[in-house]
Regions:
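Charge-rich, well-structured scaffold segments of protease-associated domains
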Residues: 3, 9, 20, 64-214, ...
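Short, cationic low-complexity segments
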Residues: 270
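C-terminal active-site subregion of NodB/CE4 polysaccharide deacetylases
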Residues: 224
């Protein structure tokens, strides 16, 4: 556990985790729910994200404009986000306004009246349409489909336009009642705060009890261990390409090895992919590797955007780099540089109360240990050349890698 982090549980079962940062005069507060697009059926595709929008539209005490005016009047910045496994409302504000901001976020989370739903449908449909016009974003969804197929992890967070256009209010309200329950909620805060005071505020939250017969257990997802091809035809200047396969889950102790491997391979401006594809050959402006971790699986992937004339060479270079990282040990210089890069990001993010809040929230939501900064740095320092080689060999085998592409012509 971090030196200043504390975890408590309210009488209703809500978990509360806080981290005191006495050197600041602000607080970052998040109300997190263990629900996202992974928890949807095909008939609900996109309801988690749509519901996130609707939480801002009105409560018994505030209209949508009054919610915005209230936050502005408290000098707060606020927003919300939905992922495949979580949804959360969050705000940053002066510490003197903690009570008021907490009450407002709590009312939005649990007492939304879902007014003006049709106008917000149109907003979300426009967001989906905008996303469709961004091939550099959409290609990651096609890769997820190739890896996870017709499972919740294979579907996009925004969902399907026909579902959003037609899903009725009672179905949205039922989803809210079944997912926004005490056992699924974590209150997280970081900044100049008092833990016991935050717990007292959380005690006032009154989520619905878990409906009879409803379970929050996750259905296991079994990613494809055989590579697949997904191609989407679109009139684009560049071809947007993702290559990737199943990765490690978020509880895997090798997540620190993965962070260092990513830095070496494609996660920094001195990485192998950046140097070879962009700097040495000029084949792309944007190229890199990335990883995602979920409860029981993950993704390890590469992205490149390049013009049609460069597609073949870019893919050939990336293939060669995949072979090299998988079969040849990295140098000690590369390893040291990557470790310092990862540690630097950890330390710099620790200077943000919002980043600290998000880190302790995710750890609590997913039953992970709350590591101190020194503990995380020690785990990065402990990564060895052998561990990098072993993980790269496991994740980057050609037989398990899928390819997704958005471009003009599949041939």
């Amino acid at each position: 556990m971090t030196e200043t982090a504390r975890v408590s549980e309210t009488a209703s079962g809500i978990q509360v985790v806080t981290e005191v940062v006495p050197s600041v005069r602000s607080v970052a507060l998040g109300l997190w729910v263990r629900t996202g697009s992974r928890d949807e059926t095909p008939a609900q595709a996109g309801v988690s994200h749509f519901l996130e929008h609707l939480l801002f539209k009105g409560t018994p005490n505030y209209s949508a404009i009054e919610i915005s005016e209230r936050f502005d009047g408290l000098g707060a910045s606020f927003n919300a986000a939905t992922s495949k496994e979580t949804t959360h409302l969050y705000a940053r504000f002066l510490d003197e306004h903690t009570d008021e901001v907490f009450d407002l976020l709590g009312e939005m989370l649990l007492e939304s009246t879902f007014p003006d739903i049709d106008s917000e449908r149109d907003v979300v449909l426009e967001e989906i349409a905008m996303y469709e016009d961004e091939p550099s974003d959409r290609v990651h969804d096609y890769l997820a489909d190739a890896i996870f197929g017709d499972t919740p992890l294979g579907r996009r967070i925004l969902g399907k336009a026909d579902v959003i256009a037609n899903i009725p209010v009672p179905d949205i309200a039922a989803y809210h009642r079944s997912r926004y329950t005490a056992d699924n909620i974590v209150v997280a805060a970081a900044g100049n705060l008092d833990h016991d005071a935050i717990v007292a505020m959380a005690e006032k939250l009154k989520p619905e009890p878990l409906p009879e017969g409803v379970s929050h257990s996750l259905e296991p997802v079994h990613p494809s261990m055989n590579g697949r091809l997904e191609f989407a035809t679109k009139d684009t200047e560049q071809y947007h390409i993702c290559i990737g396969g199943p990765g490690i889950d978020r509880s895997d102790e090798r997540r620190f090895v993965m962070a260092v491997l990513d830095s070496i391979f494609g996660g920094s401006s001195s990485s192998r992919l950046f140097r070879e594809v962009r700097e040495n050959r000029g084949l792309a402006y944007s190229v890199g590797s990335y990883s995602e971790q979920f409860t029981d699986t993950g993704v390890a992937a590469i992205y490149v955007g390049t013009r049609e004339d460069n597609v073949e060479e870019a893919c050939s270079v990336i293939g060669a780099e995949l072979d090299t990282i998988r079969t040849s040990p990295v140098s000690e210089d590369e390893l040291l540089r990557a470790k310092e890069h990862v540690k630097g990001r950890l330390v710099l993010s620790g200077e943000s109360t919002a980043a600290r809040m998000g880190r302790i929230a995710r750890a609590t939501l997913h039953d992970l240990p709350l590591l101190t900064l020194d503990e995380m740095i020690a785990r990065v320092d402990a990564v060895s050349v052998g561990e990098i080689s072993e993980l790269a060999s496991e994740l980057y085998g050609s037989e398990r890698l899928s390819l997704a592409c958005v471009g003009r012509d599949e041939d």
